[in-house]
Amino acid sequence: MANALIEDLKWRGLIYQQTDEEGIEELLNKEQVTLYCGADPTADSLHIGHLLPFLTLRRFQEHGHRPIVLIGGGTGMIGDPSGKSEERVLQTESQVEANVKGLSNQMHRLFEFGSDKGAKLVNNKDWLGQISLISFLRDYGKHVGVNYMLGKDSIQTRLEHGISYTEFTYTILQAIDFGYLNRELNCKIQVGGSDQWGNITSGIELMRRMYGQTEAYGLTIPLVTKSDGKKFGKSESGAVWLDPEKTSPYEFYQFWINQSDEDVIKFLKYFTFLEKEEINRLEQSKNEAPHLREAQKALAENVTKFIHGEAALKDAIRISKALFSGDLKSLSAKELKEGFKDVPQVTLSTKTTNIVEALIETGIASSKRQAREDVNNGAIYINGERQQSVDYELSSKDLIEDEITIIRRGKKKYFMVNYQS
């Protein structure tokens, strides 16, 4: 019998591979299932490239199943070779511990913890750290054939350039994770990105060999791709992080609202919990009135609210509207710095100067003649307000919180003016 959750995941395009499609559907239909997804603490924050497997795990929770969120405090000391063309640089134990703390805090935004049926947060260092070298080789290594491991894509792709024994053993450690969670918490499904297929199947095979366990399954999520061929999860400024100190909620919101018409419906299915009917309505709106960008607004609002909360979403929308309308004086210096993060930074030696002199000193104008022409032609805006007098004097009233001034030349060329103290 078809399972409603699996049907929804298929409609959203969220299933890439399943170890046993019929077995998974039968299991989900007969009981509340415990399943898990993990992340190694390679940084102290997740970025949006990590989101999809965990959002998929959250969908299982929404349907009454119990998710286990695993932070790899143990495996993070080793490094997963999957999807990597060269050896990872090993982190110190203190780095890994700090990163574990950061990721653990973020998971509380993604899942409901606490109740008997709530999500459970675990750190695989708690059990991997207890295994001795002799036990690893005798109790686990004995059940994993070298030829079997060499057949894994994550290993094969690295053999030409070399792989250390450290990373070679990674798949066994992740296999031990699945076996431990299966025995201790009755965990029967592992969810992961498409690059985790080899690690997931290793866990299932290890359980079969060691315990005769056959009721263990794997499900992978597709790699997120963009229609233009560019890598998903990157903005012009770099990775889009979940940590608001690394990527502000405004920048986060802007990333989503700027998605193309070609990608927006797919991303609504992937990254939001909107119902099928609403997404279909937004698709119709996108097709009939693309200029309204209703689908992009829904995507940005839903994902930003889920990750950062209602208040941060309202601030992001307010900043966006102010920047679009040119009402710059309604924003704080911090908000302006977020909004104009990527514009040229220029410096003035004094907070009081003639507008023409200011344009020359900052390099916005190449000569006094050009500066005068720009001002007279109405091409110069100070904090969103047009200034057409060459006699205008910049003063303290043109400073936002006594820190910065935003000068615009023409329709779109912005400059952030800082002042020498």
Swiss-Prot record:
Residues binding L-tyrosine, per UniProt: 36, 170, 174
Residue window of motif 'KMSKS' region: 231-235
Top-level EC class as recorded in UniProt: ligase
PROSITE patterns on file: AA_TRNA_LIGASE_I (PS00178), S4 (PS50889)
BP GO terms, sorted: tyrosyl-tRNA aminoacylation
Subcellular location: Cytoplasm
Ranges spanned by the short sequence motif 'HIGH' region, renumbered to the chain: 41-50
GO cellular component terms attached to this protein's record: cytosol
Keyword Ubl conjugation in annotation: no
Cross-referenced SMART domains: S4
Entries under InterPro entries matching the protein: aa-tRNA-synth_I_CS (IPR001412), aa-tRNA-synth_Ic (IPR002305), Rossmann-like_a/b/a_fold (IPR014729), S4_RNA-bd (IPR002942), S4_RNA-bd_sf (IPR036986), SYY-like_C (IPR054608), Tyr-tRNA-ligase (IPR002307), Tyr-tRNA-ligase_bac-type (IPR024088)
Chief place where the protein resides: cytoplasm
UniProt-listed Enzyme Commission number(s): 6.1.1.1
Keywords attached to this entry: Aminoacyl-tRNA synthetase, ATP-binding, Cytoplasm, Ligase, Nucleotide-binding, Protein biosynthesis, RNA-binding
GO molecular-function term, one example from the UniProt record: RNA binding
Statement: the UniProt record of this protein carries the keyword Metal-binding: no
Disulfide bridge map: none
Binding site for ATP: 234
Complexes and interactors: Homodimer.
NCBIfam families in the cross-refs: tyrS
Protein name: Tyrosine--tRNA ligase
Organism annotation: Staphylococcus epidermidis (strain ATCC 35984 / DSM 28319 / BCRC 17069 / CCUG 31568 / BM 3577 / RP62A)
Gene name of the encoded protein: tyrS
